[in-house]
Structure formats: C-alpha cells, structure tokens
Amino acid sequence: MYKYKVIMTGGGTAGHVTPNLALVPSLKENGFEVKYIGSKDGIEKEIIKNNNIPYFQISSGKLRRYFDFKNFSDPFKVLKGIKDANRILKKEKPDVIFSKGGFVAVPVVIAAHLRKIPVVAHESDMTPGLANKLSAPFCNKLCVTFRESLKFIKDNKGVLTGSPIRNEILHGSREEGLKICGFKQEKEVILIMGGSLGSKIINDQIRGKLNLLLRDFNIIHICGKGNLDNNLVNKAGYKQFEYVSEELPHLMNTADYIISRAGANSIFEFLALRKPMLLIPLSKKASRGDQILNANSFKNEGYALVLNEEELINDTLYNKILELKSNKKIIINAMNNMNGKNSIDLIVEVILKSIKR
C-alpha cells in the first residue's frame, strides 16, 4: 500500500526524462506510487513506457525563443494541455508533482497550481531553461544542480541538490565493456559522446586524427544515428556505435577519458565515475549557451578541460587530449575532493517536505 502518489513530468529530450527515472527507485522505497504525464509523441513516451510506469499523454506546444509561424498556434495547444492535465490530476489526486522541465511540463505545473497541488521542479543546467522560467512562479521549490544557479531563483525557492545519477551508471563493468568493443591491445580508452544526435564536427575531428590517436588509445565512438563510417567498421582499436542504451554503463566504466558535449546530466555522471573529461560545449549559435556555462564551471572546479567549437582547428583537439592524459591524476584528485551528498536523497527529501507542509 502506497503512502503517497507523485506524478512526474518532463520531456522533449532525454535529458528531461532520464533524471526522473533515476529518482523512481528511491521514491518507491519512500512509499510513493509513481505515474507520469508527457506529450503524445515525445521521446519521453517510449522511455517511460519501457520502464513500466503508467503514462498519461497531453497536448503540448513547443516553447521557442525564435520566430516561427507555429508560435501563433502553439499557445492554444498549451491551453489544451492545461485542460488535459487538469482532468488527469482531478482523477489521480496526486500528493505532489515533480517536473524536470521541457515544454510538456508547463501545462502540468500550471494545472497543479490551480488545483493547489505542490510542485517541485529540477533544473539541470546552470541557468533555468525557458520551461522552468515559466514554471517557477507556480513551483514550491526548484532544485538546482550548480551552486551558481541559486542566484537566478527568486523567492527563496532554490535548493542545491545536484543532479540525480542513475544507479545502473555506477555499476558498469570494464571487463564487459572491453568485451563489447573487442579491443585486443592493452591501451587506455577514450569514449567520445557527441550528444543524443551526435556531432558532425566532433566526429570529423576524431576520424581525421584517428590513426594518430590509435597509437596510444583505444577509441569508443558514439557518433549518432546515421553517422557510422562504413570504411572504419573493422578498424582495430576503434569501435563505433550510432546509439547505445544497455551497454552505456559498461562503456562509461571502460573509459579512462571522456570527450563529450557538456549537457549537465551527462557531465555529472562522468564526475560520479571520476572520469577525466574534455568538454566541447554546444556553441551559442546552436543553443542558449547553457553548455558553455556548465563546461566552464567544471573547468573552474578542476574536473574538466574545455575546448570550444570555434577552436576545433588543425591539431587543437589532439593536443588537448594529450593535455588531458598528462593531467589525469590532478583531475581525479580534484574529483575525489568534491564535497557531495547523494543528490537523489536530497531531491526526495525536498519532495517529502513539500507534501508535509
């Protein structure tokens, strides 16, 4: 018998969904029944259903910072989404809503506020995304990942919790990872991750220096859907994947170094695993600049080296990898000196307190 019911929401990208999944086991241990509200065709639908969590779908319009003719119709989708969410909340009667952001979350948060249901939200990046900015007035508490984020949260709603880490990430097997990749030589391993869709510029840079890199390293390259290079399928010491799921914990634990974009959820997983990282954040041309802030924060803490996209010319990436290798012990020592409580426990504590008020 459950003590409480929480309805989670968040979607649009995997980064708005996977942290929710990290919380589910602890929520259930604390007596919560867990259900989910997402969009009709977002990435969250498949992910949540694959984890056997009851799923409700609502209408949702995308929130854009740029001109698009859909900006005229999407507000009506948001209004319908509020109506859809209100109907679900009236029937389900949850004790609390937990929002991870993304455009689908806004109607749910507003509907919860109208029904006087407490809302706890979480922001992964250093500055709040548009969805969390719009949701903030209707939230009881907004959990943040970076200490620097607290200054952006009004009305004393901000709580520093860090980023929830999926338990399975911490229990990968290096031996299994090496088996998956089929590496024959004993070399240090670099894992390259270009985000869920891959990164052409990172892929091209790595492959352009591949023969040089393979002298000293084995390479695991998660290159994104449609980005496999058929000419490199049987290249010794080089294993490429379009996308990985169940294998990811093993591959991450196999890696000695990680080259990656700077999404907050991912880099905190690397930190939890004590993996020295070279971060190549999305440029301001392709984003709101949040990854640049994330990367620089980790650089300042001594957890990472940073190489901006516009610096990816000639031998800069190769030289930065050599610098990462030479600073391996220093970076790991900085990570080991980190003062960090269990983020999942902190977030669940905030959720419980929001109910008991």
From Swiss-Prot:
Enzyme Commission identifier(s): 2.4.1.227
Binding site for UDP-N-acetyl-alpha-D-glucosamine: T13, A14, G15, R166, S196, Q291
Keywords annotated in UniProt: Cell cycle, Cell division, Cell membrane, Cell shape, Cell wall biogenesis/degradation, Glycosyltransferase, Membrane, Peptidoglycan synthesis, Transferase
One Gene Ontology cellular component annotation held by this UniProt entry: plasma membrane
Catalytic activity: di-trans,octa-cis-undecaprenyl diphospho-N-acetyl-alpha-D-muramoyl-L-alanyl-D-glutamyl-meso-2,6-diaminopimeloyl-D-alanyl-D-alanine + UDP-N-acetyl-alpha-D-glucosamine = di-trans,octa-cis-undecaprenyl diphospho-[N-acetyl-alpha-D-glucosaminyl-(1->4)]-N-acetyl-alpha-D-muramoyl-L-alanyl-D-glutamyl-meso-2,6-diaminopimeloyl-D-alanyl-D-alanine + UDP + H(+)
Family named by the database record: Belongs to the glycosyltransferase 28 family. MurG subfamily.
The name this protein goes by in its record: UDP-N-acetylglucosamine--N-acetylmuramyl-(pentapeptide) pyrophosphoryl-undecaprenol N-acetylglucosamine transferase
